[in-house]
Design a protein with these regions (language model features):
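TOPRIM metal-binding catalytic domain and adjacent DNA-binding surface shared by DnaG-type primases
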Residues: 1-71, 80, 120-121, 162, ...
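Short, functionally important structural connectors and interaction interfaces within domains
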Residues: 5-6, 21, 105, 145, ...
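Phosphate-handling DNA/RNA-contact segment within nucleic-acid enzymes
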Residues: 44-165, 182
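TOPRIM fold recognition
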Residues: 84, 123-126, 135-230
Length: 230
């Protein structure tokens, strides 16, 4: 698939660019994290031409791929590891944008799902964060962690996670958006398979950078020990 090739190239060359690496390291990411999740960056976006409707839609929504240039690129992979969406971070305007292929719209998309899936299958539990950085941080303690890219699970996302997990644990931010997302999810899908936990006033990524890896793991485990027993 053409997005697989694009993501692979963007990941291969990201270490050549000081600005995105400095930013990612400032958010607590290591080179190992960057390689694991295939996070990338390109100055010029070149994507192999494809005659599909997906390609045409992506070409138009990204303004001939110019919207992907000079952005940090977080690939959204399906359960087979194929890229079916992209989340980008603009380092100048400090904004995120998301782009989905038709498959992602139909079955739901997450950041980190492919990497987390073996652990979700094993535990039958999944932790869901809003943002990619929080998911990467939390996954250092509990690898069965994904990012929903928003503070609410849509129907496709919920059904996809339910296929692999008996318990979906929302770890959203303790703010208005996070609280609303939790309540909306519980109202929409009920409490049978959904749970939620607040880890504190800050998010996972902030705690990781503040506490360091060892203290962070101890802190996170103390916050969700009761949920793990259920």
């Amino acid at each position: 698939m053409y997005l697989n090739e694009f993501v692979k190239h963007a990941n291969q060359v990201i270490l050549d660019y000081e600005e995105p690496i400095k930013y990612l390291q400032g958010r607590g990411l290591t080179d190992k994290d960057i390689r694991k999740y295939e996070i990338g960056y390109v100055k010029v976006a070149r994507i192999k031409k494809d005659g599909s409707e997906d390609y045409k839609t992506l070409w138009q929504s990204t303004y001939e791929f110019r919207s992907l240039q000079k952005k940090i690129i977080f690939p959204l992979k399906n359960i087979l590891g194929n890229v079916h969406g992209l989340c980008t971070r603009d380092l100048v305007e400090k904004r995120y944008a998301q782009y989905f292929l038709n498959e992602a719209k139909k079955i739901g998309a997450f950041f980190g799902l492919f990497e987390a899936l073996p652990h979700i299958r094993k535990t039958r539990k999944v932790f869901v964060h809003e943002g990619a950085f929080d998911a990467i941080s939390f996954a250092k303690v509990f690898p069965n962690t994904v990012s929903s890219l928003t503070s609410f699970l849509n129907e496709q996302q919920y059904e996809l996670l339910r296929f692999y997990a008996d318990k979906i644990i929302l770890v959203y931010d303790k703010d208005a958006a996070g609280n609303h997302g939790i309540q909306k999810s519980l109202y929409t899908y009920g409490e049978r398979y959904l749970d939620h936990v607040y880890i504190g006033a800050d998010d996972s990524n902030t705690y990781l950078r503040t506490l360091g890896p060892e203290r962070f793991e101890k802190y996170i485990r103390s916050k969700i020990s009761i949920i793990l027993q259920n």
